[in-house]
C-alpha cells in the first residue's frame, strides 16, 4: 500500500500538484502491549523475530514497556522501510495515535458524536481476552493473531429435563426440536454441574466457562462423567417426549455446551452416527421436501457415505440438505402449531416460544477459533452498559451512501459494494476496558476508545501534527474550542497560529485518496466515510478511496509480522534493491488482486531494470542524424505517453508500468534494430522516459537522470505531456512489421529458405475502392449499392471485374473498424527493403501492383492496401 501511495503521490507532484503525503503510527490497541508481554516473559518466538530483524539486545530489554515498543518500531518503519524505499512522505507531519494531542483530538470527536445523538449505551456481547480484556475481531486483525474472519453465532440453548437437572443442547436450528430422537454426550469428557439461577445444568467445563461470561450468577458446583449419562433418558421440551442419551465422540466439549441434540431425519451427522452404533431408533421426519421421504438417510445413501470419519462428505451433505430444506421445506404435522409453515419463513418463532416458556436461552460463540495477540483464546463476554457509535442511524447512512456516489473509488467493484456495506453496518462498540494503549473515553472513566473508532478522522490531524512536532503547539492548548475552530470554522481564532492552522486545513482538505488494504473494506473505510459525514462540513468529506489487495505467502495468507513466513523487508531490499521491489509490487499483478510472493519473479524485475539501464547507456552512445524511422519512434513514444497518463489518472498502476518498463523498452529496441541513431531525438525521449520511471523506480531514475546531465532532480521535473501522434508514421511502420511477420510465417509454413523475396503493393483500382469506401463510411452512406454506383462513374474502374467481390469484403471490414489507406506504402516498403533483406538474408524486390513485374508465386493480384 505504501508503494502504491508513493507512486501516486510522486506522479501527482510531477503533474504540477502540491502533494501532502503524510504518515503515522496506529499504536492504539493491543499489538504493542502483547509484544511487550511476550518480551517480558522471554518468549523465544518473539525474541528470535526481533533478533532476526536486527533489534539490538540492549533495545530488546527495553521492549517489555509498550511505549518503548511504539518508539522502537516507529523508528524502524521510518528508517528501515519508508526512507529506504524512498517514500515521498512529509516527515514533518509524523504522529502516533497515543500522543497527548491526538488523544485530545479523538475526545473532541466523541463530544461531537454525542452532541449529534450518535452515541448510545446498551448491553453488548463482546469478544474478550481473559488476559487483555475486550478485543476487536475483524479482518484487520488489529488486536488478534488468528480468526479475523470469525463470525459471532447465536445458538439457541434448549433445556432438556434430566432427573432434576438440565441438559442444555445448543443448536442453530431450534425449529428441528420436534424431530429430536436422542441426545449425544461424549463418554470421555468430564462434564461440569453448574448452577445457573435456580437450575442445575450439566455442561462441558469449556462451555461452563463461556456461559459464565454471558449469564450472571453461574457457579460450578460439581462434575459428572459422560459415561454416567449414557443410557439414561431426558425429556424434549414442547413435545414432552422421552429420548435416550447416547455416546458420541463428535460431541466436542469445545463447541458451545458440549451437549448435542440428535435429529437423524434431517442431520446427516446424526443419521450416520446412529448407524455406526447400530441404535434401533427411527428418525422422526418434521420437514416435507419434494423428492425426499427421510432426507438425511437418502442424501447419505446417495453420496455413498458409510462412516462418521467421512467428515468432509458429511459436511457437504449437511450443507446441501440444509439449502434444500430452507428453500423448499415445509414443517409437517409433527410440529404442532407450526405445521404448514415454510422453513424459510419460520425465522425466530420457535426460538422465541421456547425462551418465553423458560425452555431455552441464548449463547453466543465464534464460528472459528479466535486467538488474541497475547496467545490466549478469545471468548464472548457480556458488557451490560457498552457504549456504541450509532452507525445504524438512518439519516447518517443515507447521507453517506449519497456521498459515495460522488467519490472516486478503486476498484470500481468496491464502489458498487460500499452502499450495501453502509446499509449493513450496524452500531459499533467503541470502548474497551483493559490494558490498552489509546484515548481515554471522556464519558466513562477507565475505559479506552477502541482502535477502529480512534482512526476515522485521523487524516485531519496531520494538519496539526506538523505544528506539534515543530514545538509551536502544545496539547494543553488543544481544547474543544480549538478543534471547533480549526476543523469546523466555528468561533474565533485565539491567536495567529490558530488562524494559520485553519488556513492550512482549508488548503489541504478534503482527502483526495485514502489507501488501505482489502481487510478494511468492511472495517475502516465505512466508518472513515460516516464519521466525516457526521462531523465535518460537506466540503471536507473525503473524495477518494483506493483498496489494495495483499502480498501473500504460498498458503494464500497475507504476509505480515504476526503471521510470520516472510523474509524481512530490509533484507529483501538489500538482496533485490528497493526499486526492484517497488516495480514488482506495481507490475506483477493489478493492485486489486492478491500477489503471491515469488523470489524468482522478483529476480526477473531486477534483471529488467538492469536491461533498461544497459539500453539507455547504449542509446546515449548513438550520435547520428535523422532517418525515416525517427518519425515512428516519436509517434509510438507519444502514443505510450498518452496510454500512461490515461492509466495513471485511473490509478491503473500495472498498465502504466507495463508501458513504461516493457513497451517503451521494446520500441527503443526496434528503433536500434532499424538503424535509428538520432542523438537529439534519443536524448529528448530518454529524458521523458526517465521522468515516467521516476514515480515507480525513483532511485534508478535519479541515477540515469544525473548521468544524462538532467537539471536538478528528476523527481522535481514535470511529467511528460500528451503530444500529437503522427498516425501516418505509426501505420507505415506497422505495415512494415506486418510484412516481415507475413514473410516469416510463409517461411515457417513452407520450410523454404528464400534467396529472393518479392513484395507487391496494392494496384491503383483497389486503392480507389478503399478510399471511396472510407469517404462513404465517414458520411454514413456506405453500402454496396452506393459504393458500386460511385465506382462505375470512373471508366477506368469498369475494366476491373473483381471490384464487386473486393468491395463487398472491404465494406464489411470498414464497418468493423478497418484502417483508412492514406500512406504511400510502396515508397515506405521500398525504402526499407535493405532492412528486410538483412532480416532474411535474401534479395528483396518491391513492386507496385500495377507494374509489369515478375510474379513467380502468382501472388501479385492478392495485394491489398495496407496488407
Give the predicted meaning of each segment:
Residues 115, 119-142, 203-221, 693-704:
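Amphipathic alpha-helical
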Residues 174-183, 189-259:
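Protease-associated
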Residues 1-35, 106, 169-172, 176-177, ...:
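N-terminal catalytic cores of NTP/NDP-binding nucleotidyl/phosphoryl-transfer enzymes
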Residues 7, 37-178, 231-235, 241-243, ...:
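Residue patterns forming the tRNA-binding/recognition surfaces of aminoacyl-tRNA synthetases
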Amino acid at each position: 500500500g505504501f508503494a502504491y501511495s508513493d507512486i501516486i503521490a510522486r506522479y501527482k507532484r510531477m503533474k504540477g500538484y502540491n502533494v501532502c503525503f503524510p504518515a503515522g503510527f496506529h499504536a492504539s490497541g493491543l499489538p504493542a502491549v502483547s509484544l511487550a508481554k511476550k518480551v517480558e516473559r522471554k518468549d523465544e518466538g518473539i525474541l528470535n523475530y526481533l533478533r532476526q530483524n536486527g533489534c539490538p539486545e540492549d533495545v530488546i530489554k527495553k521492549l517489555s514497556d509498550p511505549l518503548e515498543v511504539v518508539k522502537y518500531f516507529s523508528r524502524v518503519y521510518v528508517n528501515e522501510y519508508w526512507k529506504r524505499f524512498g517514500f515521498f512522505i512529509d516527515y514533518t507531519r509524523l504522529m502516533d495515535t497515543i500522543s497527548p494531542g491526538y488523544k485530545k483530538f479523538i475526545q473532541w470527536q466523541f463530544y461531537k458524536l454525542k452532541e449529534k445523538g450518535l452515541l448510545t449505551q446498551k448491553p453488548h456481547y463482546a469478544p474478550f481476552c481473559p488476559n487483555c480484556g475486550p478485543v476487536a475481531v475483524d479482518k484487520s486483525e488489529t488486536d488478534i493473531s488468528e480468526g479475523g474472519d470469525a463470525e459471532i453465532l447465536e445458538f439457541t440453548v434448549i433445556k432438556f429435563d434430566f432427573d432434576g437437572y438440565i441438559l442444555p443442547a445448543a443448536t442453530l436450528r431450534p425449529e428441528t426440536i420436534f424431530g429430536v430422537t436422542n441426545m449425544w454426550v461424549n463418554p470421555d469428557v468430564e462434564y461440569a454441574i453448574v448452577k445457573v439461577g435456580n437450575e442445575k445444568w450439566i455442561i462441558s467445563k469449556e462451555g461452563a466457562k463461556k456461559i459464565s461470561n454471558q449469564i450472571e450468577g453461574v457457579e460450578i458446583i460439581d462434575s459428572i462423567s459422560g459415561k454416567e449419562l449414557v443410557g439414561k433418558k431426558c425429556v424434549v421440551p414442547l413435545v414432552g417426549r422421552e429420548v435416550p442419551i447416547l455416546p458420541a465422540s463428535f460431541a466436542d466439549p469445545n463447541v458451545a455446551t458440549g451437549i448435542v441434540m440428535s435429529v437423524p431425519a434431517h442431520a446427516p451427522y446424526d443419521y450416520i452416527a446412529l448407524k455406526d452404533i447400530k441404535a434401533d431408533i427411527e428418525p422422526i421426519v418434521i420437514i416435507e421436501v419434494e423428492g425426499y421421504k427421510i432426507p438425511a438417510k437418502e442424501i447419505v445413501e446417495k453420496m455413498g457415505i458409510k462412516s462418521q470419519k467421512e467428515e468432509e462428505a458429511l459436511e457437504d451433505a449437511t450443507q446441501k440438505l440444509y439449502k434444500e430444506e430452507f428453500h423448499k421445506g415445509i414443517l409437517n404435522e409433527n410440529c404442532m402449531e407450526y405445521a404448514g409453515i415454510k422453513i424459510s419463513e419460520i425465522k425466530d418463532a420457535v426460538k422465541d416460544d421456547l425462551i418465553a416458556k423458560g425452555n431455552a436461552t441464548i449463547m453466543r460463540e465464534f464460528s472459528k477459533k479466535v486467538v488474541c495477540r497475547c496467545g490466549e483464546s478469545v471468548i464472548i463476554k457480556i458488557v451490560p452498559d457498552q457504549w456504541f457509535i450509532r452507525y445504524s442511524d438512518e439519516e447518517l447512512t443515507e447521507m453517506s451512501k449519497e456521498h459515495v456516489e460522488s467519490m472516486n473509488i478503486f476498484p470500481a467493484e468496491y464502489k458498487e459494494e460500499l452502499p450495501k456495506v453502509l446499509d449493513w453496518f450496524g452500531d459499533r462498540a467503541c470502548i474497551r476496558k483493559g490494558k490498552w494503549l489509546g484515548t481515554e473515553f471522556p464519558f466513562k472513566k477507565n475505559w479506552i476508545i477502541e482502535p477502529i473508532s480512534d482512526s476515522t478522522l485521523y487524516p485531519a490531524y496531520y494538519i496539526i501534527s506538523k505544528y506539534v512536532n515543530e514545538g509551536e503547539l502544545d496539547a494543553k492548548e488543544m481544547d474543544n474550542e480549538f478543534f471547533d475552530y480549526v476543523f469546523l470554522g466555528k468561533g474565533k481564532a485565539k491567536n495567529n497560529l490558530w488562524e494559520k492552522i485553519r488556513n492550512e486545513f482549508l488548503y489541504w482538505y478534503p482527502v483526495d485518496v485514502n489507501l488501505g488494504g482489502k481487510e478494511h473494506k468492511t472495517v475502516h473505510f465505512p466508518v472513515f466515510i460516516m464519521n466525516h459525514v457526521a462531523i465535518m462540513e460537506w466540503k471536507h468529506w473525503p473524495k477518494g478511496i483506493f483498496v489494495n489487495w495483499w502480498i501473500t505467502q504460498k498458503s494464500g495468507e497475507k504476509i505480515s509480522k504476526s503471521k510470520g513466513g516472510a523474509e524481512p523487508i530490509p533484507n529483501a531490499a538489500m538482496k533485490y534493491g528497493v526499486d526492484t521491489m517497488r516495480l514488482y509490487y506495481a507490475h506483477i499483478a493489478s493492485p486489486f488482486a492478491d500477489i503471491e510472493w515469488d523470489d524468482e519473479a522478483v529476480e526477473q524485475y531486477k534483471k529488467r531494470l538492469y536491461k533498461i539501464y544497459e539500453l539507455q547507456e547504449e542509446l546515449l552512445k548513438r550520435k547520428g542524424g535523422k532517418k525515416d524511422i525517427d518519425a515512428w519512434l516519436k509517434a509510438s513514444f507519444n502514443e505510450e505517453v498518452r496510454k500512461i497518463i490515461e492509466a495513471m489518472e485511473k490509478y491503473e498502476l500495472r498498465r502504466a508500468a507495463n508501458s513504461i518498463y516493457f513497451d517503451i523498452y521494446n520500441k527503443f529496441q526496434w528503433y536500434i534494430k532499424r538503424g535509428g541513431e538520432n542523438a537529439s531525438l534519443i536524448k529528448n525521449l530518454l529524458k521523458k522516459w526517465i521522468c515516467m520511471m521516476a514515480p515507480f523506480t525513483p532511485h534508478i531514475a535519479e541515477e540515469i537522470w544525473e548521468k544524462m546531465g538532467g537539471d536538478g532532480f528528476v523527481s522535481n521535473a514535470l511529467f511528460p505531456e500528451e503530444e500529437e501522434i503522427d498516425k501516418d508514421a505509426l501505420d507505415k511502420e506497422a505495415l512494415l512489421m506486418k510484412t516481415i511477420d507475413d514473410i516469416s510465417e510463409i517461411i515457417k509454413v513452407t520450410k523454404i529458405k528464400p534467396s529472393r523475396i518479392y513484395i507487391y503493393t496494392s494496384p491503383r483500382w483497389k486503392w480507389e475502392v478503399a478510399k471511396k469506401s472510407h469517404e462513404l463510411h465517414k458520411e454514413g452512406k456506405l453500402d454496396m449499392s452506393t459504393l458500386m454506383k460511385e465506382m462505375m462513374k470512373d471508366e477506368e474502374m469498369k475494366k476491373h471485374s473483381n471490384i464487386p467481390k473486393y468491395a463487398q469484403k472491404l465494406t464489411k471490414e470498414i464497418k468493423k473498424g478497418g484502417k483508412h489507406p492514406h500512406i504511400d506504402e510502396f515508397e515506405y516498403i521500398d525504402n526499407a527493403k535493405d532492412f528486410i533483406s538483412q532480416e532474411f538474408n535474401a534479395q528483396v524486390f518491391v513492386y507496385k501492383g500495377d507494374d509489369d513485374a515478375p510474379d513467380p508465386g502468382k501472388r501479385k493480384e492478392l495485394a491489398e492496401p495496407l496488407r
